Amino acid sequence: NSGYSNIHNEMLFDFVVFVFTGPRTRKVKRREKKADEKRPRTAFSASQLQRLKQEFQQSNYLTEQRRRSLAKELTLSESQIKIWFQNKRAKIKKASGLKNDLARQLMAQGLYNHSTVPLEADSMDTKLLNGQNTSGDCSRSDYTSDSDGDSLTH
């Protein structure tokens, strides 16, 4: 129903934001936000990144006090600091190839494959990925990517 989707897209949602004001006390701040509104990506300066990396080398995790201090020093919000550290830990975990037990079990059963095809895939690979049969004797399902997603194999 297109009438419903138009109304749905224009609806405003209330979000609850917790503002840290000290140990174990929080104030609730309410604000309205459009459903399709997205926060812009944070562009860290070179000096901010250098300082964040330096702090990360000392410890992968920050105390609340250290996060507050770093946020003030770098003129960033505590959330930006927290998310940067979370993303950095996730990036390292992904690069190390560590997977949880469930993911390993699913991979062993052939039920877990989040491989991607590289951007520089040639035109035949692209046609195959788009479901276009190029030779008449194979289908899209006949091709799989390797574990790193570096190439397609038949």
From Swiss-Prot:
Keyword DNA-binding: yes
CDD domains for the chain: homeodomain
Region feature Disordered, mapped onto this chain: 127-154
Record PROSITE patterns: ENGRAILED (PS00033), HOMEOBOX_1 (PS00027), HOMEOBOX_2 (PS50071)
Top-level lineage group: Eukaryota
Cellular component, GO annotation: nucleus
Family of this protein: Belongs to the engrailed homeobox family.
Name of the protein described by the UniProt record: Homeobox protein engrailed
